[in-house]
Amino acid sequence: MVRIAIAGAAGRMGRNLVKAAHHNSEASVGAGSERPESSLVGVDVGELCGEGRFDVALVDDLSKAVEEFDVIVDFTAPVSTLANIELCKRHGKKLIIGTTGFSEEEKLVIDAASKEMAIVMAPNYSVGVNLVFKLLEKAAKVMGDYCDVEIVEAHHRHKVDAPSGTAIGMGEAIAGAMGNELNDVAVWSREGITGERTKDEIGFATIRAGDIIGEHTAMFADIGERVEITHKATDRMTFANGAIKAAVWLNDKPAGFYTMTDVLGLNDL
């Protein structure tokens, strides 16, 4: 049984992660944390999520419950995730990172940490999205040289980063399959007189509205036809279940940097 700590357990995603861990036969909820200023600190994590009493009180710092978990699942914010990396390094814990919006420098910190600890990091933990990444690699190898590639993503009004980590992951899959670095070919937005698009660019468009959980479309557009590969999430539990699956998988792995491709065994597709 893998004992899991949920960072940000009182948030929308955090509560779903608690539920997913509780209902996974190979996992249990060992700890949950929330910001120190939260009025929910001290509340039972299970009761908070409507799952009954777990006898696990929400703490303001996971270091206070370090003996109660094996793996942290973190879908919070970069500064909090980086702090949890240091905690994991000190205490021999493992980490699932679902946080997005890291700077390039912060990504280097995560990569360096993976030499000392086991990390799974993915822009999206749903099985469907990770299959889409593989499909995009295949499509890019066939159509990328002659099609215009555009990525459109939509999320709820509360999402604070753009484009989404999943959209960036889609772009990285396409660019990598074509032998490019995404930062060299990405056009993150367009406004005003932009001139004609260049052959290699990958365009991004972002929508923020209402309660959209997450919708992503990659478009390969040629003259006379267009191929679109789309994923639509209708319930956050799909992300939560995937993250807990990753935590169970990671528990017996050595130090290293892993992705959902590793967790799901998609490397040979």
From Swiss-Prot:
CDD domains: DHDPR_N. One of its GO terms (cellular component) is cytosol. The active site is at H155, K159. The keyword Cytoplasm applies. It is an enzyme of class 1 (oxidoreductase). NCBIfam families: dapB (TIGR00036). This is 4-hydroxy-tetrahydrodipicolinate reductase. It comes from Vibrio atlanticus (strain LGP32) (Vibrio splendidus (strain Mel32)). The gene is dapB.
